Amino acid sequence: MKQFIVLTVVLLAIQELQGGAVLTVDEKCTCKDTLNTLSKDDLILRLITCTQRNENLEGIITAIKKDNDFLNKENDALRAQNCELTAQLAKEKKAREAAENALCECQKNSELLKQTIEQLKKELAQTKQELANCKEALANCKAENAKLLKKIEELNCTITQLQEELEQCRARERDLQCQLDECNKKLTICNNELIACRKQQEELRCEIERLNAEIKRLEAQNAACENALNTLRCETSEFLAIATQRQSKLTTIIQSAEAESTAIGASYIGFRNTHDLTCAPCGGPA
């Protein structure tokens, strides 16, 4: 009777797992041979273990899916950052090309100024030579000397002006060189950040692939547990059906035996009431 109560509790537990569905035994199910070899405690333990394992696997799969969604969002953010850095790098390249073009133009102007200065130096040397010659004939060439002095003064002013312009060009060249160095530094930093982003993106891609493989493995394991649980349900249904049938037969036999015992008792009482069972030698009832 206690075993029947325990089996009834197990049946109710299985029905609760199935959402209240009524269990039926498939006539073609071959699980009863395996189930008959299990004790009551083994059967309950096996059911509890399968149920707990199924719940644990569902929790793990849910957590892994959440991690996978988080990694996908982070990967999208890194892709957007990569696009932004690529656009910034293109702008830096254009600025660098513009600075290089300006530097080339400045170098050309500087070369022209150098040529002009060399030419002026030659003219100045020639003028000095003429001035030396004029000093020999200073008395006769005062008017010519005044003109030459004026010309020398003009040349000196021109040289001073050219030297100032040359100094300005050199200062401009230094500024452009500093700007070019700064652009190169920024370009190096951008390249390093781009390499780091690509490396991190590759690591995240590998991690996502590993998590996907883990999810597939856990899903396969969950399917195996589901199959084992279905098998156990079939075995339990078969066993409960057999136990119920045997209990019904046993109840019928007990009821028949009780009826026969009652009939025998009634017959015995009726026999004693209708027959004299007094023992002759002792005078007492037989």
UniProtKB/Swiss-Prot annotation:
Q: What range does the record give for the signal peptide?
A: 1-19
Q: Which UniProt keywords apply?
A: Coiled coil, Glycoprotein, Signal
UniProt-annotated stretches for the region Helical:
61-235
On the tree of life, the source organism's domain of life is Eukaryota
Q: Which residues are glycosylated?
A: 156
**UniProt miscellaneous comment:** The DNA puff II/9 proteins have a proposed intermolecular coiled coil structure with possibly intermolecular disulfide bridges formed by numerous cysteine residues in position D of the heptad repeat.
- Under what name is this protein listed? Puff II/9-1 protein
